[in-house]
Amino acid sequence: MFVKCSCIWYNKNMEKNMFNINNNELSYGRGYVYSLQYHLVWCTKYRKKVLKDGIDAECKEMLCDLAEEYKFQILAMEVMPDHIHLLVDCRPQFYISDMIKIMKGNIARQMFLAHPELKKELWGGHLWNPSYCAVTVSDRSREQVCSYIEGKKEKQ
């Protein structure tokens, strides 16, 4: 038999502490409850330091626009000269690989249009390295990840 407790379903035989989730941090969909946060990192091609001198601010603005359009939240963000750190909260309908593809593709297209000089520095026509890092974030590690991301720019 299942019992509903604080918007989380669990079997009576399970311990209540097993679901140590703050209800304020849960998101609700039609028929489901979720909390999905990822720490995402991706680098420029050849680790070239091209995300600087105002381009970093444009990149942040583009990421915020994409978050609004695709309905995910950016909890923390830092654009470094050669890579990007994001902490995102997203819906379960999106594959994280698709989200990253959308972000990298849209930003590259807009950056190359606005800054044609980037193509000269990044021969081959690619702004981003094809790889990325995506790590799930728990309630316990979220504060550490936020502090890490926010502290990246200060260390430069």
Could you describe each region identified by the protein language model?
Residues 1-156:
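Basic nucleic-acid-binding interfaces
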